[in-house]
């Protein structure tokens, strides 16, 4: 989690959030993680967002406070980025926002819209990738045959390998695909409003104004596309069928697909290769009562381990 927060901070604002250095979850990280819990409610029941401003119910009140604090964190990161550019005369490194400013976004977007997008970038690029990475490492450590096959593929990597060397590693990519299928970061529905005139969908007419949604969790467990769907089985991706492609949407789909999907795959490949090159004998720990139940998915807006921990024995 600390790594993904620092990566998205560096790419978006030109600086990390200091999580790797401190090794401590501060309030800002906890707040962004908490958004995953209330995000599902807001996605399915958008009226709740409005009611939370007026109802004295603790969970709604706390969610609103957290939301506004994350806006403040995003604005602070934007302000620090702007100050560095002003002091240096130019951006010391390319960032998401330096590209937006170059494109004249500040002339099109209001300051509030820029801040809101900054907040979305942090939310979308941090806890999501971190949760997928946790499940990937856990699953590979838990299944010896999968780990052996991955280690065999990684044998030829030099110690200071780069991303280009990982792009064409078939089994590594199979593991990433299977992780995104079984442990997709965003399992809940993504609501869409039917436009004027209505729409025909799978032989059914949907009237204008109705809300329709797709749910990755169910699609990714379609037994026709994925036999034995609850099994973590990367080998299934060695012979990808069209039905598998049609039922796979870890990043959404269409024109609204996730902006950071390529970044997520880059991080998953790099971290997986580095972790198992460094700790080839890693296994799932049983310390402190750690067990499979800790890793059962808790489904909010994001998928997270219900035990909120994943203990790994690095030395096997």
Predicted segments — roles?
Residues 12, 133-137, 216, 268, ...:
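Hydrophobic, repeat-rich solenoid/adaptor surfaces of innate immune receptors and signaling proteins
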Residues 3-7, 131-135, 263-274:
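Short amphipathic alpha-helical face segments that pack within enzyme cores
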Residues 1-133:
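Cytochrome P450 heme-thiolate monooxygenase catalytic core
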Residues 195, 214-241:
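Conserved cytochrome P450 K-helix/beta-meander segment immediately N-terminal to the heme-binding cysteine loop
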Residues 300-316:
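C-terminal helix/juxtamembrane-tail motif
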Residues 24-34, 90-96, 139-186, 202, ...:
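Cytochrome P450 I-helix active-site segment
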Residues 144-146, 243-244, 261-301, 305:
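Cytochrome P450 heme-binding "Cys pocket" and the immediately downstream C-terminal segment
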